[in-house]
Amino acid sequence: MFEKFQAAENRYDEINHRLSDPAVIANQDEYKKLMKEHAELEVLVTKYNEYKKLTKEIADAKEMLNEKLDKEFREMVETELKEAQEKLEVLKKEMKILLLPKDPNDERNVIVEIRGGAGGDEAALFAGDLFRMYTRYAERNGWKTEILDSNPTEIGGFKEVVFSIEGNGAYSRLKFESGVHRVQRVPVTEANGRVHTSTVTVAVLPEAEEIDVEINPNDLRIDTYRASGAGGQHINKTDSAIRITHLPTGLVVCCQDQRSQHKNKEKAMKVLRSKLYEMAREQQHNEIAQERKSQVGTGDRSERIRTYNFPQGRVTDHRIGLTLYKIDDILDGDIDEIIDALITTDQASKLANGAEDDED
C-alpha cells in the first residue's frame, strides 16, 4: 500500500515541476489534464504526509520511553504514544479507502428519471416532492438542473419527470438514489384521514458524452408533436415536442420542455445517449445490471429502498438500516447524512471484498 503512496508523491512532484514549464502552460489541453491529475494526487500526498508525520511521532515517543524518565513525564509520553497509535489505525483505514478503484463515472453529470408507481395521484404528488428534494440538493451544491421532459398532473406533481443535474461529482453523490421510494401519509384528497402507502421509482444515469456512444442516424425514428401541459392541454401552437425511437433497442425518449424543436431534439439525444450508455454498462457488468434491476424494480409497494413516513416524521433507508427523524429537512434537500452513510457502507463492503481477495 505504501509503495503506491510513494509513487503518487513522486508523480505529484514531477507534475509540479512540469506545471512551471512554459511549453506546458502554453498547451491548455495538456495544462488542464495535468492540473486535474495534480488535484487527484494531492489528496493522496496530503494523507501520506500525515502518515509519515504520525509514524515519526510514534518512533520518537518509543525512543523517548527507552530513556530514564520521571514517572509523570513517562505517563504523559505513554498517553501521547497511545493516542498517536490509535490515530494511525484510523489513518491506515482512510488510506486504504483512497486506494479503492474509482468508479469511472463518479465525476459525470447525471440524468434523473422520477416516475409515479403504485398510488395514482398521491404517487404523482410524491414524485413532485422528490423532484424538489433533488433540485434543492443540487442548489445546495451549486449544481445546475434542467428539466428535459415532464408529464405534470392537474393537482400538482408529476406522472414522470426527467431532468439533468450538472456539477462536479454529481453521479458519485446521487448514484445510490436509484430504487423505489415509498411514502406513507394522509393524501390531500383523503376525507377521513387514513394513511395511504404509495411508491415512486427513481433512476439515476451517468450522462454520456457523444464520444461514449456511437448512434447511427439511420437507427432513429424522430416524431414531432405538440407539447402539452397538465391535463393534456396544448401549451404550444407549434409541433416543438420531440419523440425519438432507437429502432435496434426499442428505447423511446421524449422532450417537450423547450420551446424550440431543435433544443428539444438536442435534449432528447442527451437522454438517449445516456440510456444507451447505461445499457452497454449493464451488458459489460451483469452483476451491476442485476443490482440495478433489483433497485429500480417495477414500482410495486413491496419493493423499496427508502420509506418516508409523514405521521412519524421519519425517513428510513432499508439498505443500511438508517432512520432519521427529520423528514421536512430531508425533503428540502438535506440528504447528505443519508448519502454519506451509503457511501461509507459501500466503501466498507469494497474493503471487505478486497481483504477476501488478498486472502485468496
Curated annotation (Swiss-Prot):
The modification N5-methylglutamine is found at Q233. Its main location: cytoplasm. One of its GO terms (cellular component) is cytoplasm. The keyword GTP-binding does not apply. GO terms for molecular function: translation release factor activity, codon specific. Pfam families: PCRF, RF-1. Disulfide bonds: none annotated. Methylated by PrmC. Methylation increases the termination efficiency of RF1. Keywords: Cytoplasm, Methylation, Protein biosynthesis. It is found in: Cytoplasm. Residues 286-305 are annotated as: Disordered. Signal peptide: none annotated. Peptide chain release factor 1 directs the termination of translation in response to the peptide chain termination codons UAG and UAA. PANTHER family: LD18447P. HAMAP family: Rel_fac_1 (MF_00093). Belongs to the prokaryotic/mitochondrial release factor family. This is Peptide chain release factor 1.
